[in-house]
C-alpha cells in the first residue's frame, strides 16, 4: 500500500511531528523520516500510480519514472544529510519548515498533472520563505520578504500559464511543450524565476546567505533543482534555454569573483551551475538531458557540502566574510578538507562527481556541433575553479593567519560533511553508479 502514497506525505508528517516531539524522539524523526522517504521513493512504480477526477480533469498526484525517481532520491538524500548536519544546532521550527520545504520538492518530482505540480510548487515557496526568516536577523527578515515577493510573482506567472494551457488543450497532464504562445511562455518564465535565471537572479544571492548556517544548506538544494526537473519534463529542447543558461553561467562567475561574503560566493555559484543545466535542457538531446539530470544530482551534493563547510566556519567563528577569515586549516582541518573536496567537485576535477557529470553536458554540445557553446562552457569551468575552487577555500582556510582558533565542527556537522564528501568521491571514482540510474 505504501507505493500508492506520495513519498512527500512522509516528510510532511515528519515536519508536523518535529514540532510535537523533543529529545531523542525528535532526533529519530529527523534522521529516520528521510530514510523512510527514500524507501517509499523506490517503491513507486513507473507510470501513473494514483488518479482521481476533479472538475472534469484527471488529477495524477503520483506518477513514477526514472527521471522523477532520480530527482526524488537526491532530494531525500539531501534531507537526511541536512537533518544530520542541523539537528543539534537548528531550532525545531527551522527543521520543521525545512522538511516541509523538502516535501514540496519531492511532491513536484512525482506530480503527474499541472494542478498537483502547482500546489507543491507553491508549498515549496511558502516553507522556503520561512526557512529564510529562521535566520533570525533583521537582514534575514528583509531578505525573506523580498524572497516571498519574487516567488509570489513567479507563482502568479506560472498559474496564468497553466490556466491558459489547460483551457486551450483541455489537459492538465505534465507533458513536453514548446514556448510558442502566451501561455507556454508564462509557464517557462515562471519556471525560470525559480531557476534564478536573468533578469531576476538576485533573489537567490540576496536570500540564501541571510538564512542560518543550517538553513542555507537546505536552501541550496531544492528550489533551483526542482526548476531544472520541471524544465526537463516540460521544455526539453527549447532553444531559448541555451542562451539563458550561458548567460547564467557567466553572470554567476563574474559576481562570485567580486564577492567577499563566503556564502554569497557560493550562492552566485549556484546560479552559475544551474546555468550549465539550463543550457543542457536547451540542447535537448538524450545525452544533454541526462547530463542536466546527472549534474543536478551531483550539484546538490557538492553544493550542500560547500555550504556545510562555510556554515561550520560561521557557526564556530561568527564571521562570514573572506577578509575576516584565514588560517582556519590549523584548527578546523576536517571542515577544511571537506570544503576542499566540495571545491574540487564543483570545479570538475577528475575523480570527483562534478567531472563525472559536467563532461556529459560538454559532450552533448560537441555532439551537436555547438562549437561556441562548447568553448563557453569550457571557459566557464575554468572560471568556476577560480571562485569556488580557489577563492573560497583559500581565503577561508589558508591565506593569512586571521588569529582565529576555533574548534572544528561539532560531530554531527562533521558526520554530514564526511558523508557528502564520500558521495562526491564515490560518484567521481565509480560514475557508473550514477549513470545506471539516468533516464
Give the positions of each predicted feature.
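Membrane-interfacial helical/loop segments at transmembrane boundaries in membrane proteins
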Residues: 50-56, 360-364, 433-439
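Core segments of transmembrane alpha-helices
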Residues: 76, 223-227, 418
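Glycine- and aromatic-enriched alpha-helical transmembrane segments of multi-pass membrane proteins
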Residues: 414-436
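Hydrophobic transmembrane alpha-helices and their helix-loop junctions in integral membrane proteins
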Residues: 81-96, 102-117, 127-412, 423, ...
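Transmembrane helix-loop-helix hairpins at membrane boundaries of multipass inner-membrane proteins
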Residues: 1-96, 170-176, 202
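Alpha-helical transmembrane segments of multi-pass membrane proteins
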Residues: 38-48, 346-349, 425-432
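Membrane-helix interface and helix-disruption motif detector
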Residues: 1-3, 234-240, 439
Amino acid at each position: 500500500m505504501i507505493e500508492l502514497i506520495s513519498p512527500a506525505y512522509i516528510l510532511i508528517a515528519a515536519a508536523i511531528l518535529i514540532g510535537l516531539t523533543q529529545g531523542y524522539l525528535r532526533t529519530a524523526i529527523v534522521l529516520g523520516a528521510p530514510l523512510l522517504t527514500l524507501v517509499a521513493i523506490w517503491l513507486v512504480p513507473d507510470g501513473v500510480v494514483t488518479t482521481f477526477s476533479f472538475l472534469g480533469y484527471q488529477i495524477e498526484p503520483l506518477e513514477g519514472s526514472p527521471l522523477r525517481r532520480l530527482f526524488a532520491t537526491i532530494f531525500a538524500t539531501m534531507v537526511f544529510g541536512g537533518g544530520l548536519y542541523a539537528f543539534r544546532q537548528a531550532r525545531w521550527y527551522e527543521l520543521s519548515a525545512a522538511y516541509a520545504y523538502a516535501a514540496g520538492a519531492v511532491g513536484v518530482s512525482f506530480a503527474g498533472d499541472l494542478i498537483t505540480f502547482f500546489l507543491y510548487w507553491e508549498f515549496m515557496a511558502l516553507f522556503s520563505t520561512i526557512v529564510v526568516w529562521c535566520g533570525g536577523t533583521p537582514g534575514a527578515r528583509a531578505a525573506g520578504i523580498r524572497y516571498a515577493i519574487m516567488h509570489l510573482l513567479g507563482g502568479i506567472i506560472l498559474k496564468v500559464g497553466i490556466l491558459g494551457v489547460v483551457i486551450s488543450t483541455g489537459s492538465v497532464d505534465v507533458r513536453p511543450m514548446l514556448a510558442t504562445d502566451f501561455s507556454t511562455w508564462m509557464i517557462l518564465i515562471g519556471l525560470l524565476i525559480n531557476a534564478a535565471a536573468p533578469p531576476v537572479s538576485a533573489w537567490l544571492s540576496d536570500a540564501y546567505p541571510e538564512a542560518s548556517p543550517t538553513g542555507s544548506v537546505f536552501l541550496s538544494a531544492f528550489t533551483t533543482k526542482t526548476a531544472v526537473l520541471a524544465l526537463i519534463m516540460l521544455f526539453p529542447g527549447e532553444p531559448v534555454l541555451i542562451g539563458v543558461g550561458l548567460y547564467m553561467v557567466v553572470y554567476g562567475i563574474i559576481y562570485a569573483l567580486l564577492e567577499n561574503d563566503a556564502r554569497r560566493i557560493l550562492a552566485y555559484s549556484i546560479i552559475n551551475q544551474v546555468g550549465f543545466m539550463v543550457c543542457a535542457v536547451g540542447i535537448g538531446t538524450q545525452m544533454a538531458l541526462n547530463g542536466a539530470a546527472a549534474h543536478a544530482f551531483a550539484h546538490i551534493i557538492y553544493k550542500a557540502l560547500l555550504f556545510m563547510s562555510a556554515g561550520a566556519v560561521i557557526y564556530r567563528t561568527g564571521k562570514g566574510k573572506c577578509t575576516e577569515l584565514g588560517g582556519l586549516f590549523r584548527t578546523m582541518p576536517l571542515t577544511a578538507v571537506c570544503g576542499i573536496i566540495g571545491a574540487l567537485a564543483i570545479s570538475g576535477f577528475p575523480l570527483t562527481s562534478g567531472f563525472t557529470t559536467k563532461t556529459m553536458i560538454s559532450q552533448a554540445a560537441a555532439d551537436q556541433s555547438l562549437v561556441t557553446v562548447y568553448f563557453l562552457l569550457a571557459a566557464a569551468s575554468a572560471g568556476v575553479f577560480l571562485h569556488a575552487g580557489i577563492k573560497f577555500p583559500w581565503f577561508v582556510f589558508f591565506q593569512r593567519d586571521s588569529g582565529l582558533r576555533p574548534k572544528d565542527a561539532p560531530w554531527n556537522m562533521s558526520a554530514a560533511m564526511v558523508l557528502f564528501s564520500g558521495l562526491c568521491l564515490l560518484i567521481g571514482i565509480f560514475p557508473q553508479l550514477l549513470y545506471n540510474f539516468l533516464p
